[in-house]
């Protein structure tokens, strides 16, 4: 009985010892793993810190570089703006000078044109006045000549008309006397001696060369 208890106690002790040993091993393994994990975490943290520090330094360096580049670009932009402003001012001054010169030239040309127009107007007025005077004088002379010609034509026409009428009257009278003489002669040829004697007498009232008869 006692031996069974002893054996049971022995087995229990072995089991306990094995359990403790196993527990110890497990605890050792766990501790080792914990240390390894701790070391790993520490290394990771160190690496992270290193990377963070490196990143911080890199960021800081990058910031400095960016700042310097920005400052440099700002200076370049300022210089470019200053140059552009100077060129614009020079160009503006040049344009203003050219515009002023053109304005002066246009003013001078306008003055010359106005003076030339005034001179031409005066010359034209003088020529027009002279032409009008000459034209008026010529018209006056032509009118006087036409009036004189009309007067002379009227006088000549009057004289010619009078001569024609006088000549026609003389011709009519001559014809009438001739007809009368012919009738008288005819009657004398067919009448008695008395009439013949009377016919032998000059009973004509026409006198040659006078162109008229008389009583």
From Swiss-Prot:
It comes from the Eukaryota. Keywords: Nucleus. One of its GO terms (cellular component) is nucleus. Expressed in the shoot apex and leaves. Expressed in dry seeds. Expressed in roots and leaves. Disulfide bonds: none annotated. Induction: Induced by chilling and mannitol. Induced by drought stress. Induced by salt stress. Induced by abscisic acid (ABA). Induced by D-allose and D-glucose. Its main location: nucleus. Signal peptide: none annotated. Residues 13-24, 32-41, 54-81, 88-111 have a biased composition (Basic and acidic residues). Residues 1-129, 190-215 are annotated as: Disordered. Belongs to the LEA type 4 family. This is Late embryogenesis abundant protein 14. It comes from Oryza sativa subsp. japonica.
